[in-house]
């Protein structure tokens, strides 16, 4: 029987997606996220509320590595990369890293128990790939394999991106998804009626993961995934460009985004912590965009910009 090694990283909730991505990049075959906020107001199987759950801003992200993995090297890399994330201004909190060994069947059960179907927006529901789910009329279901990490669609930055796409897309659009990760934004764009979607990520692992998630969803042959460094080599114009990545990276793509967004098109930027908000606004305004919508969840911000000559009801430019 094959055994697995389990590494648990305790970090601030704001670092959930970034740390999940990091763990996959270091060789993890899956992650599970334990967050006390998930239990607020919920009932257990007997109908009782969870009154004794201690609420905390810290979460536990558990990663699973094959027994052949050198955990000492992995943990050293994790600590080094966490320090780098903190230097970008991401709140990681007081980090602790634990590890243990477990059997394969324990690994399979452990990470799956944390993930259930989640209604993210009015129309969009994210469902784990192994779950049979009966969608209601008009409900659009995104199948994801959370063992692949790169975000499960429940983080505030992803939720706001999905909400923006739901508000903007009416059918027939071309969408560019920058830093696609799990591919969730591209899949949502397809389900919401976009004609063609181009998904880019600098990380080869993310490109593979995105394609595997896309393949789980019917009718998503209109999504084209490729490796790419932001928008530097892209020439395809788009009606909508969406990017849910760190603010320090967002400011590097605004000029190229303006070049590629069609007139009256939109730029959706998410993943912005409040202290970096002005920096992103300035970059987008300097590129020529006008601000149409500003969304906030906790310390996270998402911005919807428009490329337009009609500046009524918009800000900046």
UniProtKB/Swiss-Prot annotation:
GO cellular component terms, A-Z: cytoplasm
GO process annotations (BP): methylation
GO molecular function, one term: protein-lysine N-methyltransferase activity
Pfam families: PrmA
InterPro entries: Ribosomal_L11_MeTrfase_PrmA (IPR050078), Ribosomal_PrmA_MeTrfase (IPR004498), SAM-dependent_MTases_sf (IPR029063)
Coiled-coil spans in chain: none
Binding site for S-adenosyl-L-methionine: 158, 179, 201, 244
Entry EC no(s): 2.1.1.-
Keyword S-adenosyl-L-methionine: yes
TM region(s), chain numbering: none
Keywords: Cytoplasm, Methyltransferase, S-adenosyl-L-methionine, Transferase
Reactions the enzyme catalyzes: L-lysyl-[protein] + 3 S-adenosyl-L-methionine = N(6),N(6),N(6)-trimethyl-L-lysyl-[protein] + 3 S-adenosyl-L-homocysteine + 3 H(+)
General function of this protein: Methylates ribosomal protein L11.
HAMAP family assigned to the protein according to its UniProt record, in alphabetical order: Methyltr_PrmA
Name the record gives this protein: Ribosomal protein L11 methyltransferase
